[in-house]
Swiss-Prot record:
InterPro entries in UniProt: Sleep_regulator (IPR050975)
UniProt keyword terms in alphabetical order: Cell membrane, Cell projection, Disulfide bond, Glycoprotein, GPI-anchor, Lipoprotein, Membrane, Secreted, Signal, Synapse, Transmembrane, Transmembrane helix
Localization, UniProt: Cell membrane; Presynaptic cell membrane; Secreted
Name of the protein: UPAR/Ly6 domain-containing protein twit
Post-translational modification: GPI-anchored targeting the protein to the cell membrane.
The encoding gene: twit
Cytoplasmic domain ranges by topology: 162-166
Role: May be involved in the exo-endocytic cycle of synaptic vesicles.
Organism: Drosophila melanogaster (Fruit fly)
Residues linked to a lipid group, GPI-anchor amidated asparagine type: 140
Length: 166
C-alpha cells in the first residue's frame, strides 16, 4: 500500500472512531435524566419536609415506601426536543391567604434564561412570592441563595488564611 492510500485509510479510520466516540458520549448524556424533588407543602404530611426550607431528614420514609410515593422524579424522560429543556423548579406562592411551597419538574425553552420564572405570572388569585429554576440534580431542595450565603461566610476565612500565609 502506498503512502497516500494509507494516509487516506488512516484518516477515514480516525474519522469513524471519532464519530463513534461522539455518538457514545451523546447516548450517555441522553441517558442521564435530571432528578428533581416533587412535593407540595399543601399535601397532608408534606408540610414537615416540603416547606420553604426543604428538610430531607423529615421525609417519612416508612410512609413513602408503604404508599409507593416517589418524591424524586426523573424529568427528562418525556422530553426529546432540540428546543426544550427540563429544569427543577421551586415556587413559593400565596393562595387564598395560605403560603404554599411546591417543587417539581418544569420544561422551558432552551433559549429562555433560568431567571424567567420570576417574571412569569402564576394562576389567577395566586401571588407568587418566589420562583427559581435550576439545572442540577435535586437542586430544588436547596435554600434560595444558599451558595451566595456560603460564599459570604467563606470570604472572611479566606482573607484570614491569606493574611497568615504572607
Amino acid at each position: 500500500m502506498s503512502a497516500v492510500p494509507m494516509k487516506a485509510f488512516l484518516a477515514g479510520l480516525f474519522l469513524l472512531a471519532n464519530a463513534w466516540h461522539i455518538t457514545a458520549i451523546n447516548e450517555q448524556h441522553q441517558k442521564h435524566h435530571l432528578q428533581c424533588w416533587h412535593c407540595s407543602s399543601d399535601t397532608i404530611g408534606a408540610e414537615d419536609f416540603c416547606d420553604v426550607t426543604f428538610q430531607e431528614d423529615n421525609i417519612p420514609t416508612d410512609l413513602i415506601k408503604e404508599r409507593n410515593i416517589n418524591l424524586l422524579r426523573s424529568c427528562n424522560g418525556t422530553i426529546n426536543s432540540d428546543h426544550e429543556r427540563a429544569v427543577c423548579r421551586k415556587t413559593v406562592e400565596e393562595n387564598n391567604g395560605k403560603l404554599i411551597t411546591k417543587r417539581f419538574c418544569y420544561y422551558t425553552n432552551k433559549s429562555d434564561p433560568v431567571e424567567l420564572c420570576n417574571i412569569t405570572s402564576p394562576e389567577k388569585n395566586v401571588r407568587r412570592i418566589f420562583c427559581e429554576d435550576c439545572l442540577t440534580d435535586r437542586c430544588n431542595g436547596a435554600l434560595a441563595g444558599a451558595s451566595i450565603l456560603e460564599m459570604l461566610l467563606l470570604l472572611p476565612i479566606a482573607g484570614l488564611i491569606q493574611q497568615f500565609a504572607i
